[in-house]
């Protein structure tokens, strides 16, 4: 049975970040039951295996910033920018695979920095 997963979660208040970026403002969470884990740790844990589209956009005031999209703590994408940048990847996820975003940069909050995860198959 195909279970559709759709998640949009954005950064709360802006702050300097060195490590996992916490996206605390959950806007959409269809098919996701572990929303407290995402809010508290910034880590998405896959509950339903499938093919996923993962999209991240980050806004920062720093002229040279970098962030990493991680699957099970391994880099699957990197974003470099002087103000706003986005990264989109497609990944096969199995149950308990994790997705997180890390970096050492100032991250603007609200809808200026968000993580989107969509199960496409």
Question: What residue ranges belong to the model's regions?
Answer:
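Extracellular jelly-roll beta-sandwich "head" domains, especially the C-terminal globular C1q domain
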Residues: 1-121
